[in-house]
């Protein structure tokens, strides 16, 4: 499947830059000979593009070399020239006269303004006018006016306001139209009613670049319809360890399979008038232990060979932007790496567009903060994504240029790149976004887009087990469809779905979408059969049990082991209970990665890896069910794009990905094929070393939920983002502590009424084991404003049962604005009246007066970590 043979591709990507001119000429001759041997166009146009892109690793070393000696063949020299001209991306064309003239006319302030990107929650239209900002973005779960249910008209109204401000020159602004970026990673996933396609891991299993190109174009049209011109996609990460929380954003663990998707996505988006972004440069899928934003430990040649293929192809296709990655490379944050961002990406790979930083990514560079990082600009960041602290960043860049810390030439290069992109997509001459979008208003969730999504769903599912050819099922009988994921469009869509984490949604948030249950029920009804959802409703002919991961995004999804439900095994118990009906059970597993589900595979009669299919549940029904005549409707085309693990951990070294493969890349059974998989090992290698209960770590962890309580509503579910108590006394909002949205800001008003934020769950929890082991409740707090200094920690164990502890002492232990990790021994709560065997809320904060805090990292642990401040039981 390689467009380049492995030995040739290695030469192209990894040719040492210090190679002598003679070695470079030898490479040219070798390329020419190989091309002649394979024919003029052995694998289509992709070959010449890759050759041209790859040559940059060697061609850059030719500058200043003498002309080839006379014994160099004319044929070889001609071949080099042809290969260099095969794609324009290999030779920077430079700015157009228009861009050059525009740059010349800009003041320093206007240039720096073009380099700044703030988040819409922190940027008003007048800010765009006053500072001449070049860009805004909406992060995951960020909406116009803060309205989750914002209409297309409201999206366009905000886009129009930013546009009008950007061309308003009354405050000294240069009048350059702004560009708005968004994370539309599986459809326009922030917009209610948009088509939601399968996440990349499913598209990798479908393995059809042409289909993926159609999805990219459809997504771009829906994005354009809301007045947005820039998509932060495609993700061309090559996920090597499924423990990584962003595995589902990767098409495959195979660099070649990832490579083949890059060009169709870039082309599909940019031909639809929207800027594409290849991300995250580079190595985000190869971090140690799969830790998000962690360290990728590879030499340069291996880094490019394993993680650079998608960028080579995206650049060859003309991607206009590249996003830098959070992760480090051998200990150093890539946001500060000139070697990778400039020497490799821009100079050797020939990237002509602009590089944008990731969300506050510059702040992770050693010696930098979120609002101050000359090193990142000098390394090659052209546009800085600074969601909240953009104004301070703007002022700091100005000061650093004036002080000589950032060369003016670096500013000019960055702004030139940004202006070239704006010119390329016609932004410099655009009309108001609402006018541009008028012909596209009807495309949001359009039937033709949903048809593409449905096709992608049915072609992505992988049949892992199929005893006696059970699947597809006959729809003319009675089917029991059940399980926690059966009727949940949010769960089947995964992270980056309306909210950043994909949590806090109901089926009502997906107008036009269809759950797996609804998709099955519609087809069964049409065939004359019936669907029931519990054994109490009748006796089924077969059972479909849908289960899987709760949605997550980024580091929140990082896991220590691939074991599914290592603690509870509730799904296994449910499958076994359903088998007691005497009817066959088809298990449909919703996940963002291959996982160790040996026990569940052993138990079920058939097992389907459904990945995260998105809004079109009918696509799942298409392959699970036969038609009304008992015939196969569609084949099972999905084949694994990542290996499926035999064990939960690497037995020899848990730091490494699981090496023992149960099902290899390319595996998948056909519809009706008899594939029996039994006797798989069910003993876990990884053993839980602690019984710690995590309530909040980046997000609220299931089964816990966060509630706001006051005199009007004692149990208002807060969801994953901003919320207010019913009477308005307490507001909750998401903020950043260490990574994006990993903390919550709690602001009490001066109401005189006790208002509480607390964690609860549907069933009582037995914490007596942790209490008996000397455990503690731990939490991190930062005091922002302390008007009343009236704060209590509250816990509950049912009606008229609980304990309250005064927390006024925290105002004495930390300075205003300082994060402190606290621990309260569980024995304190037990003494105060908390029944440890029936805890319904182990943590809450209550106040009656004006107080603003930030909260993070809430857990009940056996042993608090180092640096924790232990609170005294009886202290006020």
Residue ranges with predicted function:
Residues 7-15, 20-51:
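Bacterial N-terminal signal peptides that target proteins for export
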Residues 61-64:
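C-terminal motif of bacterial Sec signal peptides marking the signal peptidase cleavage site
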Residues 66-714:
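Glycoside hydrolase catalytic-domain context in secreted enzymes
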Residues 480-481, 624, 777-781, 841-845:
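Buried hydrophobic-core signal for structured, non-transmembrane domains
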Residues 685-737, 869-876:
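Extracellular carbohydrate-recognition regions
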Residues 725-759:
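Short carbohydrate-recognition loop motifs
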Residues 752-833, 847-866:
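Extracellular ligand-binding interfaces
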Residues 831-841:
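Noncatalytic modules at the cell exterior or secretory-pathway interfaces
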């Amino acid at each position: 499947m390689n467009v380049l043979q492995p030995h040739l591709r290695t030469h192209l990507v990894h040719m040492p830059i210090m190679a002598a001119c003679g070695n470079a000429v030898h490479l040219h001759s070798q390329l020419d000979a190989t091309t002649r041997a394979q024919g003029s166009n052995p694998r289509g146009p992709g070959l010449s593009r890759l050759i041209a892109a790859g040559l940059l690793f060697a061609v850059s070393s030719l500058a200043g070399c003498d002309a080839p000696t006379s014994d160099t063949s004319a044929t070889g020299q001609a071949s080099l020239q042809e290969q260099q001209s095969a794609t324009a991306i290999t030779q920077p064309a430079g700015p157009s006269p228009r861009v050059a003239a525009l740059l010349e006319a800009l003041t320093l302030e206007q240039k720096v303004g073009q380099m700044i990107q703030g988040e819409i929650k922190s940027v008003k239209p007048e800010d765009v006018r006053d500072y001449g900002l070049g860009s805004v973005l909406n992060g995951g779960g960020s909406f116009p006016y803060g309205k989750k249910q914002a209409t297309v008209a409201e999206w366009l109204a905000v886009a129009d306001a930013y546009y009008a401000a950007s061309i308003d020159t009354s405050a000294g602004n240069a009048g350059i139209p702004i560009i708005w970026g968004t994370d539309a990673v599986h459809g326009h996933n922030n917009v209610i009613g948009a088509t939601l396609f399968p996440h990349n891991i499913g598209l990798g299993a479908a393995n059809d670049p042409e289909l993926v190109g159609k999805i990219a174009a459809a997504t771009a049209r829906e994005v354009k319809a809301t007045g947005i011109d820039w998509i932060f996609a495609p993700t061309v990460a090559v996920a090597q360890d499924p423990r990584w929380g962003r595995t589902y954003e990767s098409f495959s663990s195979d660099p070649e399979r990832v490579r083949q998707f890059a060009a169709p996505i870039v082309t599909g988006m940019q031909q639809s008038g929207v800027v594409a972004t290849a991300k995250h440069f580079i190595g985000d899928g190869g971090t140690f232990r799969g830790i998000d934003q962690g360290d990728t430990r590879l030499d340069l040649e291996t880094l490019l060979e394993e993680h650079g293929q998608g960028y080579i192809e995206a650049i060859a296709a003309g991607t206009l932007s590249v996003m830098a990655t959070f992760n480090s490379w051998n200990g150093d944050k890539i946001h500060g790496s000139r070697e990778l961002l400039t020497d490799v990406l821009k100079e050797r790979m020939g990237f002509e567009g602009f590089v944008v930083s990731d969300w506050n990514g510059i702040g992770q560079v050693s010696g930098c903060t979120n609002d101050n990082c000359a090193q990142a600009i000098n390394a090659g960041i052209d546009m800085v994504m600074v969601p909240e602290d953009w104004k301070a960043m703007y002022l700091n860049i100005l000061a650093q240029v004036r002080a000589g810390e950032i060369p003016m030439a670096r500013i000019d290069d960055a702004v030139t790149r940004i202006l070239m992109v704006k010119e390329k997509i016609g932004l410099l001459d655009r009309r108001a976004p609402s006018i541009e979008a008028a012909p596209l208003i009807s495309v949001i969730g359009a039937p033709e887009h949903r048809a593409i999504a449905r096709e992608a769903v049915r072609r992505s599912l992988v049949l892992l087990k199929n005893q006696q050819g059970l699947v597809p099922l006959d729809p003319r009988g009675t089917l029991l469809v059940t399980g926690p994921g059966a009727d949940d469009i949010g769960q089947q869509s995964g992270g980056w779905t309306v909210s950043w984490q994909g949590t806090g949604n109901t089926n009502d948030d997906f107008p036009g979408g269809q759950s797996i249950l609804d998709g099955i029920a519609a087809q069964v009804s049409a065939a004359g059969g019936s669907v029931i959802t519990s054994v109490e409703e009748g006796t089924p002919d077969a059972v479909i049990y849908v289960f899987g991961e709760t949605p997550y995004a980024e580091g929140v999804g990082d896991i220590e082991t691939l074991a599914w439900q290592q603690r509870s095994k509730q799904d296994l118990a449910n499958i076994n209970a359903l088998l007691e009906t005497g009817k066959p059970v088809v298990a449909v597993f919703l996940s963002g990665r291959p996982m160790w589900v040996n026990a569940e595979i052993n138990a079920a009669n058939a097992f389907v890896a459904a990945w995260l299919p998105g809004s079109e549940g009918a696509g799942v029904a298409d392959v699970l069910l036969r038609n009304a005549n008992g015939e196969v409707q569609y084949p099972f085309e999905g084949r694994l794009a990542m290996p499926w693990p035999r064990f939960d951990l690497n037995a020899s070294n848990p730091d490494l990905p699981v090496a023992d493969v149960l099902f290899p890349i390319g595996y998948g059974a056909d519809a009706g094929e008899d594939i029996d998989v039994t006797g798989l090992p069910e003993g876990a290698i990884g053993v839980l070393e602690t019984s710690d209960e995590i309530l909040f770590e980046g997000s609220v962890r299931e089964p816990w939920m966060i509630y706001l309580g006051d005199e009007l509503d004692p149990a208002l579910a807060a969801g994953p983002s901003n919320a207010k108590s019913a009477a308005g006394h307490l507001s909750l909002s998401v903020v950043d502590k260490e990574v994006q949205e990993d903390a919550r800001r709690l602001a009490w008003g001066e109401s005189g009424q006790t208002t509480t934020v607390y964690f609860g769950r549907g069933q009582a929890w037995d914490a007596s084991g942790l209490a008996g082991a000397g455990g503690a409740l731990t939490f991190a707090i930062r005091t922002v404003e302390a008007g009343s200094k009236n704060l209590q920690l509250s816990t509950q164990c049912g009606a008229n049962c609980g304990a309250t502890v005064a927390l006024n002492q925290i105002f004495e232990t930390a300075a205003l604005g300082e994060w402190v990790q606290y621990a309260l021994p569980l024995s304190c709560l037990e003494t105060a009246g908390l029944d440890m065997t029936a805890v319904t809320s182990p943590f809450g904060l209550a106040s009656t007066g004006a107080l603003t805090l930030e909260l993070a990292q809430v857990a009940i642990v056996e042993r608090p970590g180092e640096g924790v401040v232990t609170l005294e039981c009886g202290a006020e």
